[in-house]
Amino acid sequence: MKRKEMHYCQQVDGNVHKIFLYDDISKYGEWNWETWDYDESETSAAHFQKLLEAVPDGEEIELHINSYGGSVSEGTAIYNLLQESKAHKVGIVDGVCHSIAFTILQGCDERIMGYGTSAIIHNMWASVTGNAKQLREEADKLDVCMESCVQLMMRRATIDEAELRAMMDAETVLTPQKALECGLIDKIGVEQKEEPRTE
């Protein structure tokens, strides 16, 4: 059975398009023995692009997140796709929003963490094999990626860069209140929409 990693639906009244990112971010899906290749991941940037292109300009996207993170390159691409979209993007953390998933949240116009949720920010890491020269080269590449990530987070953060870097060095778990104080989200909790009364 194919695992559904991202779910998309349209809420008819109000033209709100809901996307549920409820898995690790990955370029590749499951291995397909029939095609002898990987299926497209539903949490990849390529799949996300298709979802965003289907949303008319000016309408609203609700991006619900419950993810431990995943591929930095895919997550960064998703962040930029959100930035480019002319829809109004509301990011809502429903559970956990760790690592690159928290970067994706930063691409939304409005960033919300639900009550009892958590986020984690940390330095990038990678599993690498090779000789000493190759390992040093990979470390240099990580430094470049890390610098880009810090600058991305600083676009809206209200703390200074030194404090953000210290928090990432310490692999900090953020409560909604702490994230709000740091300017990394805009709001805690989602307001319940009133249902229209029927006489």
Model feature map: region roles:
Residues 1-102, 107-199:
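N-terminal organellar transit peptides
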